[in-house]
């Protein structure tokens, strides 16, 4: 069967010619052979060229295709085929039958030679492979995705924009330089014009005497010596004189005042004055800051009560936080013990830890301090000047040291231990912001005292035995007893923050853990 309609009757052309285009040349597209069933006729499809449709068995010059399968022309085709085989010598055949005869459109698949069948199958595999690749390329989304191509494009575009920005900046810089040069050139031209104008106006007023006695001036001829007659001037000399007069008339008149030089000088002087003014303002600001710094020291003493109040509020806030933490820890301890009891474990690890801590404190209290054998009168005989509050602690060299927490002592008279957070001490201790009791063994940080017999920290404080010392924030009261550092804290003496005694620091009997 044929896939081409029968055309007009023409003379059958030979199947193979010398000038015929081969089927498997690399310069042209090969024809497609489709495999059919053994009972069907295999057809050969020729690919159309841009200007003409060349079949395998037709001449390239023909523009019409000739049907080779008409019954009345079959015998003539066989005769011409035999003639063509005789004419062609050693012609290579790619598609041939089992009888070594050339294949045509009417040749069946079973009649083809195995080599020809293998060649056709290879061609079909290549066609199917390229067809599947083209279909995958058509279905690939990256071909239609603009972001794939825009990534490199955006990078190149940003780089080009940066380069253009740099070029633009360089051009602006060069433009500024050229503008400055243009201004300088204009100033030079104007100054040169003013200089020439001034020269043309002032030269006639200052004649120059030559050696021969003649006078030379602009607009006049050189005069002759005394006693001689002037020679008549020629026409060329008269024309030169006229030109000189015209040029001098161009520069005559009232000169421009003030001159450009004076204007530039005034502008430059004004600019310098503005810079000096800025310097003066900066110096005044620095001096004002220094004066404020010196005046600030005077107000520090007045702001001390407010500072102490803020410190007290902060301590209260911290104590509240610590109390909340203690409550949370206690709740966690209770829940942990309940969980342990639920699991069948009855021992209390917290109780064992408390017992070990108590044993450590008792062992530390039994230790003998190496300075206990020293007499206590060597340090208590010296009078000490006490100032309440943080002033006492800031005045002493060792006042800045924080109080040691939970310091046990072997003797109640050896020193006053300071308890920060409910830590017991063996000796009497003083409270920081509350009124401590003189007989209570321990006192908390913000807890009340059983015997409120002492004045507050910033109230009226007792003074020393030798006289009355005025308090910083209260009134003066006479002292009844002389304070001793090793006999306990004197009420209102600022023992919580330190003492002014020089020899009290190196001879402290508090034990160190």
UniProtKB/Swiss-Prot annotation:
Main location: nucleus
Keywords: mRNA transport, Nuclear pore complex, Nucleus, Protein transport, Repeat, Translocation, Transport
Null allele phenotype: Pleiotropic phenotype, including early flowering, increased petiole length and leaf lamina folding toward the abaxial surface in an asymmetrical manner relative to the primary vein. Hypersensitivity to 2,4-dichlorophenoxyacetic acid and paclobutrazol.
Source taxon at top rank: Eukaryota
InterPro entries linked to this entry: NUP58/p45/49
Compositionally biased region (Low complexity): 51-62, 217-227, 377-386, 428-446
Polar residues compositional bias, start-end: 30-50, 393-427, 452-484
Region listing for 6 X 2 AA repeats of F-G, in residue ranges: 446-498
Sequence repeats: 446-447, 458-459, 466-467, 473-474, 486-487, 497-498
A Gene Ontology biological process term: mRNA transport
Tissue expression summary: Ubiquitous. Higherst expression in cauline leaves, lowest in roots.
GO cellular component terms given for this protein: nuclear envelope; nuclear pore
PANTHER family xref list: NUCLEOPORIN P58/P45 NUCLEOPORIN-LIKE PROTEIN 1, NUCLEOPORIN P58_P45
Domain notes: Contains FG repeats. FG repeats are interaction sites for karyopherins (importins, exportins) and form probably an affinity gradient, guiding the transport proteins unidirectionally with their cargo through the NPC. FG repeat regions are highly flexible and lack ordered secondary structure. The overall conservation of FG repeats regarding exact sequence, spacing, and repeat unit length is limited.
Family membership noted in the UniProt record: Belongs to the NUP58 family.
Complex formation: Part of the nuclear pore complex (NPC). The NPC has an eight-fold symmetrical structure comprising a central transport channel and two rings, the cytoplasmic and nuclear rings, to which eight filaments are attached. The cytoplasmic filaments have loose ends, while the nuclear filaments are joined in a distal ring, forming a nuclear basket. NPCs are highly dynamic in configuration and composition, and can be devided in 3 subcomplexes, the NUP62 subcomplex, the NUP107-160 subcomplex and the NUP93 subcomplex, containing approximately 30 different nucleoporin proteins.
Official protein name in the record: Nuclear pore complex protein NUP58
Gene name of the record: NUP58
